[in-house]
């Protein structure tokens, strides 16, 4: 459950904080993934692609840091 405090009736900042917390919790990604049924084989392929993408990103970072 996501809780957001409202200070002095400031709805704009409250809404901004709420959206930020939702993004941090990966709520939008989960909603998008659960919109349609994903077969287990497609899920494995997607997870492998995400892992490969993360490894390439880490390798690029490591290359530039040295």
Swiss-Prot record:
InterPro entries: Ribosomal_bS21, Ribosomal_bS21_sf. GO terms for cellular component: ribonucleoprotein complex; ribosome. Coiled coil: none annotated. One of its GO terms (molecular function) is structural constituent of ribosome. Keywords: Ribonucleoprotein, Ribosomal protein. GO terms for biological process: translation. The keyword Ribosomal protein applies. The keyword Ribosomal protein applies. Belongs to the bacterial ribosomal protein bS21 family. This is Small ribosomal subunit protein bS21. It comes from Rickettsia canadensis (strain McKiel). The gene is rpsU.
């Amino acid at each position: 459950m996501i809780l957001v405090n409202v200070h002095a009736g400031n709805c704009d900042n409250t809404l901004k904080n709420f959206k930020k917390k939702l993004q941090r919790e990966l709520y939008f990604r989960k909603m998008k993934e659960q919109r349609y049924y994903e077969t287990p084989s497609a899920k494995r392929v997607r997870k492998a692609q995400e892992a490969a993408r993360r490894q390439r990103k880490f390798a690029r970072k490591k290359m530039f840091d040295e």
